[in-house]
Amino acid sequence: MKKILKPYLIKKKRFVDKRGFFQELFLQKENKIKIKFTALANSRKNVIRGMHFQFKNKQTKIISVISGKILDVVVNLKKNSKDLGKIYYFTVNEGDSIFIPNHYAHG
């Protein structure tokens, strides 16, 4: 039986010293997904972005917060899913990430 993936919060350890910090954002062996590309975006405080979803070339995503925090809303769009339309709310703090499977929209 194929495992159904759901979105989840990823907490990573941040190593801090007088120079700043170091933190791993992604490890293949921990996440078991293939990375096709990476991107970086910056949003100012109180910005609301639209829901993001790719219909033809679906993308599994890991959204990481470098500084500050975000509220990310994630919606299941998988056809014939018993959870179709289910909404998840994630408060993602500085240094944390969320995993979003390819059949979910987020924003």
Predicted segments — roles?
Residues 1-92:
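Non-catalytic, conserved peripheral segments adjacent to functional cores
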